[in-house]
Amino acid sequence: CFSMSRFITRFADVVKIPEPNLAPVNLNDLVFSCKRFMEGMCTDRNIAITLDIDEELGGVNLDIALFEQVLVNIIKNAAESIGKDGKIQIRTSSPASIEIVDNGEGITKETEVKLFSPFFSTKPNGQGIGLVFIREVLMRHGCSFSLRTYADGLTRFRIIFN
C-alpha cells in the first residue's frame, strides 16, 4: 500500500511538470556538471563516463533545473543498463544537440515502441515514470529526440534543440 501511494504521488509530480523557465545555458557546461554529478555512481560500477564536446557550440534557451533532471535520469538509465564494467559517452555537437551513448544491454525493437509509455518499465522494480518525465520536459522545450540501440550494439539517446 505504501509503495502504491508513493508511486501515485511521484506520478502526479511528473504530470505537474512546471512550464519551463527558459534562460540562456551553455550546453557544454550543463553536460559537464551532470557528468560530475553522476561520476560517483559510475565509478562504483566501474563505468567510464567521458565527454566529447563541441567547443564551438553556443548556448540554448532552456530550463536548467528541468534539463539537469533529464540528463541525470538518462545517464542513470544508461549506467543501470550497463550494470558493471562499461562506458558512457556524452557528446555535444552543432547544430545544438546532446547525445548520450552507452554499451549496456541495448533495447529491442519491441521495447523501443513502448519506452515512453506511462507505467512501462524494463527494470524489475521500475515504475515507468522516468522516461515519461524526460519526454514531457523535452517536448515542452520543443526538442526532438530518439532512444535506440544501433547495429554497432551501442544505445544512443539523442536530443536535438530545434
Residues covered by each model-derived region:
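Conserved micro-motifs of the catalytic ATP-binding
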Residues: 17-20, 59-62, 122
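A conserved beta-strand-to-alpha-helix junction within the catalytic ATP-binding
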Residues: 21-35
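Conserved catalytic submotifs in the C-terminal HATPase_c
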Residues: 23, 43, 48-58, 93-95
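Short beta-strand/loop element within the Bergerat-fold HATPase_c
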Residues: 85-97
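Acidic ATP/Mg2+-coordinating residue in the GHKL
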Residues: 102
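Short conserved segment of the HATPase_c
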Residues: 107-119
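Detector for a conserved hydrophobic position within an alpha-helical segment of the HATPase_c
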Residues: 134, 138-139
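Glycine-rich ATP-binding loops of the HATPase_c
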Residues: 142-148
